[in-house]
Amino acid sequence: MISDKLIEHVKKYEGFKEYPYLDTVGKWTIGFGRNIDDNPLSSEEIVDLFKKVGWRTPLDAEHWAEKLMEKDLEDVETSLNLHIPWLALVSKNEALVLMDLGFNIGVPRLLNFKNMLHALDNDDPVTAAYELLNSRYATQTKRRAVANARILAGNSSNFLEATEKLRELRPDIYLVLEKWI
C-alpha cells in the first residue's frame, strides 16, 4: 500500500510540471517525475487513469499526474518486493526511502547500492546513511539525498556520525553536499 507520507515525500522532491521538460540528466519528463523517454505512457495506462479519474471529468493535470505517480509507485513496490526479500522487515521510514529511490532512479539502479542495502539488512543505519551519501546519486540530487540519508540514519547522532565519516573519507562529496547537511 502506498502511504500518503510517501506520496508527499515524492511530490516534494519531484515537483510538478504539467508540460514535458528535460530533467537534470536530459530525459523527457512530465508530471511528478515521470520519465517518458524510458517509461512512456501505454494505452493501458491512459485507459486505467481515465477509469480512476472518471471519463467525463475534465482533465486536471496535477490530479492525473498524481494518479500516474501512484501507479508508478505501486510498480516500484512490486519490483522491490521481488528483488529485496527482507523489505517487509525494514521500518516504514526505511521503506519510504527505498520506494523514493526506486521511483527516482529506478529499481535496477537502486539494486546497485549493494553496501547500503547490506547495511539496511543488517540494521546498520549509520552505514546505510553514509553509503547513500557516498554516491553519484547524492551529488546529483543533493537536498533529496541528504533528506533520505537523515531518514535512514534514524536519529541526529547517527546522521552526524554518517556525515563525519563522509567528510573524513570522501571530502569531495562532502563539499558538494555541505550546504544541505
Where in this protein do the model-derived segments appear?
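Short, His- and charge-rich active-site/binding loops that engage polyanionic ligands
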Residues: 28-29, 36-44
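Short, surface-exposed linear patches
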Residues: 51-54, 91, 120-121, 142-143
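Alpha-helical segment that forms one wall of the substrate-binding/catalytic cleft
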Residues: 44-86, 92-100, 104-112
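Extracellular/periplasmic catalytic domains that process cell-envelope and extracellular macromolecules
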Residues: 22-24, 90-93
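A residue-level signal for beta-strand positions that form part of recognition/binding surfaces
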Residues: 7, 27-29, 95
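Short, polar loop/linker segments at the starts of domains and inter-domain junctions
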Residues: 22-25, 43-47
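Structural recognition of the beta-strand scaffold that forms the well-ordered cores
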Residues: 29-31, 97-100, 127
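Long, amphipathic alpha-helical surface segments
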Residues: 1-19, 25, 34-38, 64, ...
